[in-house]
Amino acid sequence: MAFLLHQARFYTTVNHLRDLPPTVQPEIAFAGRSNAGKSTAINVLCNQKRLAFASKTPGRTQHINYFSVGPAAEPVANLVDLPGYGYAEVPGAAKAHWEMLLSSYLATRSQLCGLILMMDSRRPLTDLDRRMIEWFAPTGKPIHTLLTKCDKLTRQESINALRNTQKGLDAYRDQGVKGKLTVQLFSALKRTGLDEAHELIESWLRPSVADAEGAPVAQ
């Protein structure tokens, strides 16, 4: 079958939780540090050049961007591009706004069926990456990590990054986290890991898509 993600288009932008769309379709959120390559990864996954825009000033994008997936008349899911985090020059008020927006969305959005977490393969599992995991993990829903820009690593460095990140994620299971925590190497430039990421994301959506039509509208 054709990749579901290739049928993605811009839907809406929100800056406050009260403005989140009252949709019933399942959602997959994409999160990551500024400069982790999140926008580029979304574009490659969706086979489009300019679906997700990267701000010229890292860390300045403060909105949640929604992209609908599936037929335009009857979309079956939404991809949710969350604001990048961790850029040092962002004002404190903006950081506080992002923290509230991200933590509340991840913890309470009932339509959310999984989180794709982008980490630069050269610097995985930063303190802020761990904070994202800790906000979302209590929901019991899966988190899949893309170790981006792996083309910048040697083969052995890639192996080490993958092993060490998986070890770090396994520690959360030892602490009682119930949701699946998985990781893979990914390069938008070389298209490394693209098929693996497609298959995993669509596996999250398929059972949810089957149930979405009869689900109640959630705020």
From Swiss-Prot:
InterPro entries: G_ENGB_dom (IPR030393), GTP-bd (IPR006073), GTP-bd_ribosome_bio_YsxC (IPR019987), P-loop_NTPase (IPR027417). GO terms for molecular function: GTP binding; metal ion binding. Mg(2+) binds at residues 39, 61. Keywords: Cell cycle, Cell division, GTP-binding, Magnesium, Metal-binding, Nucleotide-binding, Septation. Signal peptide: none annotated. SUPFAM superfamilies: P-loop containing nucleoside triphosphate hydrolases. CDD domains: YihA_EngB. GTP binds at residues 32-39, 59-63, 81-84, 148-151, 186-188. GO terms for biological process: division septum assembly. Its cofactor is Mg(2+). Residues 24-207 form the EngB-type G domain. GO terms for cellular component: cytosol. Belongs to the TRAFAC class TrmE-Era-EngA-EngB-Septin-like GTPase superfamily. EngB GTPase family. Necessary for normal cell division and for the maintenance of normal septation. This is Probable GTP-binding protein EngB. The lineage of its organism: Bacteria, Pseudomonadati, Pseudomonadota, Betaproteobacteria, Burkholderiales.
